[in-house]
Amino acid sequence: GLASAQDTQVVKIGHVAPMSGGQAHYGKDNANGVAMAIEDLNAQNVVIGGKKIKFEMVGEDDAADPKQGTAVAQKLCDAKVSGVVGHLNSGTTIPASKVYNDCGIPHITGAATNPNLTKPGYKTTYRIIANDNALGAGLAFYAADALKLKNVAVIDDRTAYGQGVAEVFKKTAEAKGIKIVDQQFTTDKATDFMAILTAIKAKNPDAIFYGGMDAQAGAMLRQMDQLGMSNVKMFGGDGICTAEIIKIASGAKALGGVVCAEGGASLAKMPGGTAWKAKYDAKYPGQFQVYSPYTYDATFVLVDAMKRANSTDPKVYTAKLPEANYKGVTTTIAFEPTGELKNPAITLYSYKDGKKTALN
């Protein structure tokens, strides 16, 4: 029905990701996904509980820092948002999830992949992408079965994400008969990897698995070239599986040996992927990274639960999230009792002629 202007209710949806620092390119892409969803929702003139709803995004920057992550989560609780899309990093999402649970606001991440996120069993925590158990294992199977690799070195950045995905890869690879010849550690701020790469080179591995993000992986690829290691493959999870790594690696030969995994189908195989991407690129040229289709879907999943509950009150509509069966851009989204996505897909990619290309 035609709800009159005074019957319009503003409903705020929070978004959190690093909007500053070395991971801001992911954060911007995620924020774009939510902004685009909100624009599309507002064009639909959604009516819930007899009121015309105007959705607004409240964006916060967690700078990929766990302390800042919990602080902005509390800020969103205080701002009375109806739901949150975020965060990007497992290291910020896991502590923030407790804050959202305590204040009774549901959050959906389309990016944080550490399996521990859903362990506490909060009724407010949901993930709409494959977790690291799927990513790390998928990469190890490919290394062993398709590439028949024998010796692999492992490096991780000691974050919840990097350490987690590296551990799963290592466990699965060892079970498949791959020898882990060296294990080294770095940080998510490091730029110089010459010492650890030199140590690894002495062990003569077929590949390096890197648990971490693209800024470090790209610099590592350049330094591998300098050390005459451009024939050593680099494996990694979704954190390195970006368009940005091509720029960061700036012509490194070693980029040709990268194999990375992402949760979900490739854009071309997503139900609404191709049309959605064209629309995104028209709005935000050159900003696409990885997760914006997921943050777009996450926004719609929250609103879909509000519609089914006929309420925008988190205390009321959160109970409808477990029954989600939402046909999104990325896939049809339904949840396990834990809040994990049902039937998650993963896709492996390589970089052919400087372009990110799906392997399967």
Q: What are the residue ranges of the model-derived segments?
A:
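Extracytosolic ligand-binding ectodomains
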Residues: 5-360
